[in-house]
Swiss-Prot record:
Glycans are attached at N185, N398. Monomer. It comes from Desmodus rotundus (Vampire bat). This is Salivary plasminogen activator alpha 2. PROSITE patterns: EGF_1 (PS00022), EGF_2 (PS01186), EGF_3 (PS50026), FN1_1 (PS01253), FN1_2 (PS51091), KRINGLE_1 (PS00021), KRINGLE_2 (PS50070), TRYPSIN_DOM (PS50240).
Length: 477
């Protein structure tokens, strides 16, 4: 009888142990059930895209011009050939051919070699990312921990801020795939992964490109001198932008200010250029132009999506004299890199170059303050960074100088150098760049000065290192 009781007690204890171990297994089973519920979706074996129950799509036949219409039915793709016609508007990127179903509005892109995705937006040859990877459109899909990324279109991400069903998903690089992206201007590409039954954000293991191209150029030694500087070619300053504004009371447009290309779709400039508060649709940005109004062979022109002026800009002292223009484009890429068009490198937050470091400025501004017109050709000037002790009101006729400003000027003197290099009216918003780690790097934005080319009086520039956070925050989608 005692042995029987012991046996029953042992069975009860074993049963209790099994019951108490259930929560861990149940968690796993919940995850497995979720996977099975997700499994009623369809995976297109040709494109590897995932579609939900009853969702339909078009797909091209790889070896023919036929197009199939497919529908997800209980986890299986049911497909049949449908007649198509050319799309009425441009929908495919990177040279893709667009076909639209004859009887309904859906479309499909036949992508050239090296590209895939709904709109040929995925670059299968992209093996690394540049800068922070905001424009990375490759196929890397593994996080730094080795986990596989979740498809951005997954129902599991519906309540997340960034998913493939956002209205601006294609612009952010999101869609029906699980490739690493950086839609929020983070420090590098990332994705969502499953860890301990939770969805978390993890950075990806995609490598950074070994050599950044920002700040590189094919410098041409200037041959002609001009008052205030030297005539130059755009290939010597490929980050230089020209900003134009529509005339308010007449047709046409006028040159407004200079600007600086800092990424494919963003131009940095001076806030004081927009004191008249031009709406974005009245602005135009030209890149790759040597002559101010004469079109160049390799120039690129863009309308403006956004004009962001620093919220604390002081139009009296010119403190916080900084603004951002977002270029308008139908794709994630705006400016195409070339010898004439290339972004400048932004500085590290702690970058401090030695006093009297030689730097360069460029712009289409006046030759001197009394000139009636702006320069017809791009000019460059060579100036040196002034010590902070020489960048004060005392040396600038009691004008206000804040910690958000820096000074630079031409320190050459004597009869050999009668032409003092300096910025002037019309150069505003342009760059002050210096060599750092073999790349030209943006130190300042041309802001204000006392006259133009006055001996021993420096020009004043917006100190870019003070605004890296502001730039980053405002470039976020």
């Amino acid at each position: 009888m005692v042995n029987t009781m012991k046996t029953k007690l042992l069975c009860v204890l074993l049963l209790c142990g099994a019951v108490f171990s259930l929560p861990r297994q149940e968690t796993y089973r919940q995850l497995a059930r979720g996977s099975r519920a997700y499994g009623v979706a369809c995976r297109d074996e040709k494109t590897q895209m995932i579609y939900q129950q009853q969702e339909s799509w078009l797909r091209p036949e790889v070896r023919s011009k036929r197009v199939e219409h497919c529908r997800c039915d209980r986890g299986l793709a049911q497909c049949h050939t449908v007649p198509v016609k050319s799309c009425s508007e441009l929908r495919c990127f990177n040279g893709g051919t667009c076909w639209q179903a004859a009887s309904f509005s859906d479309f499909v892109c036949q992508c050239p070699k090296g590209y895939t995705g709904k709109q040929c937006e995925v670059d299968t040859h992209a093996t690394c990312y540049k800068d922070q990877g905001v424009t990375y459109r490759g196929t890397w899909s593994t996080s730094e921990s080795g986990a596989q990324c979740i498809n951005w279109n997954s129902n599991l991400l519906t309540r997340r801020t960034y998913n493939g069903r956002r209205s601006d998903a294609i612009t952010l690089g999101l869609g029906n795939h699980n490739y690493c992206r950086n839609p929020d201007n983070n420090s590098k590409p990332w994705c969502y992964v499953i860890k301990a039954s939770k969805f978390i954000l993890e950075f990806c293991s995609v490598p950074v490109c070994s050599k950044a191209t920002c700040g590189l150029r094919k410098y041409k030694e200037p041959q002609l001198h001009s008052t205030g500087g030297l005539f130059t070619d755009i290939t010597s300053h490929p980050w230089q932008a020209a900003i134009f504004a529509q005339n308010r009371r007449s047709s046409g447009e006028r040159f407004l200010c200079g600007g600086i290309l800092i990424s494919s779709c963003w131009v940095l400039t001076a806030a004081h250029c927009f004191q008249e508060r031009y709406p974005p649709q009245h602005l135009r940005v030209v890149l790759g132009r040597t002559y101010r109004v004469k079109p160049g062979k390799e120039e690129q022109t863009f309308e403006v999506e956004k004009c962001i002026v620093h919220e604390e800009f002081d139009d009296d002292t010119y403190n916080n004299d900084i603004a951002l223009l977002q270029l308008k484009s139908g794709s994630p890429q705006c400016a195409q890199e070339s010898d004439s068009v290339r972004a400048i490198c932004l500085p590290e937050a702690n970058l401090q170059l030695p006093d009297w470091t030689e730097c360069e400025l460029s712009g289409y501004g006046k030759h001197k303050s009394s000139s009636p017109f702006y320069s017809e050709q791009l000019k460059e000037g060579h100036v040196r960074l002034y010590p902070s002790s020489r960048c004060t009101s005392k040396f600038l006729f009691n004008k206000t100088v804040t910690n958000n400003m820096l000074c630079a000027g031409d320190t050459r003197s004597g009869e050999i150098y009668p032409n003092v290099h300096d910025a002037c009216q019309g150069d505003s918003g342009g760059p002050l760049v210096c060599m750092n780690d073999n790349h030209m790097t943006l130190l300042g934005i041309i802001s204000w000065g006392v006259g133009c080319g006055e001996k021993d009086i420096p020009g004043v520039y917006t100190k870019v290192t003070n605004y890296l956070g502001w730039i980053r925050d405002n470039m976020r989608p």
